[in-house]
């Protein structure tokens, strides 16, 4: 009988990343053939694989940027090998990144465990931040909220390590955005979730202009709030849509938006019954979102209210069902929407994080918008089909895929070290 890990792994095909899985397959060959008998050479064999992938990425960038090549050759070799591959906004120094991560993770020293999804994810992250730092043009760093800056459902406390790194980014001249699915249309809710960051900002030795480079994009792309400080007190103020929202979104028909959310709500209610969810489960309708969230139940043994969680498989079933129906619904086809599994709940938002990042790129620099190769989005949800709202951010800029706030801290430490090294060269 397969282990629980193997069973769940096979069930999660829609959560796999085709590019990472393809690289895993390339690395499996030298691992199987050489890892035991020629372990000393494993690093060199893995290095050659990443060198070849690096070359394929560079070729794809060239083909994608040259219309004459695109017309003549059709698509790059990498597009043929990984048909779902997206756009690369920068080259990726994968060879160097592998050697760095190998020094940390001893990938080539392992005789029984082949290079894993997480190994490759970290290598890709390292390659991206090294390239961005060396290019010297990084201008915008955006973050998801839950599981990226703080634990799922938590808030950003003043003692959280990531805050110091965010302040250093602001001090280095970066624009910092928090692009979150949390769809509050008032500043108070964001101030409550990010109170630790605001309190540290008040004490930080940063000019007001640097603090103004911090923004929150709520509801993925629906509500923009900018940081301010008055009389020593920091907070967020809402920015009028006319200042930052694109003309295309202004032209979306409100009836189409309402119809999309109405259908999503009807489906959530039907699925609540069909999947026999706990009676406490709630369906919440907002201005530009609708979601299903776990409720509370009194536990007589504990003597207090506890959350009644929803099964992970149930959350994924809801996401894929609602998304599949909306994709074939004419009003939803005339707008943009995002269905995703938030880890404990499911939401359907109007818009998406690609729009949220793009809006920030234009808001911070209206005359010359920040380009995708000058942007980095850090998030935890990049699965390519359903259930992952950070995935769309890949359309607007470079990305780093993390799995916890601790990984975010480590990633920012590496990024800041690279930026400092380039500054001192």
From Swiss-Prot:
Q: What regulation of activity is recorded for this protein?
A: Allosterically activated by ATP. ATP binding is a prerequisite to magnesium and substrate binding. ATP binds to 2 of the subunits in the homotetramer inducing a closure of these 2 subunits and the release of the C-terminal loop, thereby activating the enzyme.
Instruction: Give GO BP annotations, semicolon-separated.
Output: inosine salvage; nicotinamide riboside biosynthetic process; nicotinic acid riboside biosynthetic process; nucleotide metabolic process
- By what name is this protein known? IMP-specific 5'-nucleotidase 1
Species, as recorded: Eremothecium gossypii (strain ATCC 10895 / CBS 109.51 / FGSC 9923 / NRRL Y-1056)
Question: What does it do?
Answer: IMP-specific 5'-nucleotidase involved in IMP (inositol monophosphate) degradation.
Known EC number: 3.1.3.99
Q: Does the keyword tRNA-binding apply?
A: no
Assembly information from the UniProt record:
Homotetramer.
Q: Where does ATP bind?
A: 104, 122
* Domain of life according to the entry: Eukaryota
Q: What keywords sit in the KW lines? A: ATP-binding, Hydrolase, Magnesium, Metal-binding, Nucleotide metabolism, Nucleotide-binding
Top EC group: hydrolase
Please tell me where Mg(2+) binds in this chain: 144, 146, 380
* Active site, per annotation: 144 (nucleophile), 146 (proton donor)
Q: Which GO terms describe its molecular function?
A: ATP binding; IMP 5'-nucleotidase activity; magnesium ion binding
> Which reaction does this chain catalyze?
IMP + H2O = inosine + phosphate
State its cofactor. Mg(2+)
Task: Describe the family membership recorded for this protein in Swiss-Prot or TrEMBL.
Answer: Belongs to the ISN1 family.
Q: Which residues bind IMP?
A: 144, 146, 152, 180, 345, 353
